[in-house]
Amino acid sequence: MPAYWVARSRIIDPAEYKKYTDRIPAIFAKYGGRVLARGGRFQIMEGPEKFHRFVVVEFDTFEQGVACFQSPEYEEAAAFRRNGAGEVETVMVEGGDATPSSLPSRAGR
């Protein structure tokens, strides 16, 4: 089942951030990632407008996406971004339909 790496970012230092983005295409390719959206037009539909760049990458499986994020290559590239060049929130989402039977139980609430 496909999975999607969704990242929201705010670039603080474009020159340093570019050191990160220059390395990313080869890393995504190594792990089978396909960029579906990167930096295009967007509209905040709900919530605060904190970020100004969005990226969506598809992987064949959830595990491939997580392996990419946790890889030494990605960690090395992300160090440029994490050193103050940008602020990012990333989530890996497995594709599919979240039917009531697949949602977490609310027991004990």
Q: Model features per residue range: what roles?
A:
Residues 75-92:
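C-terminal structural segments of small proteins and small subunits
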Residues 1-54, 59-70, 94-109:
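Short S/T/G/P-rich N-terminal loop/turn motif that feeds into the first structured element of a domain
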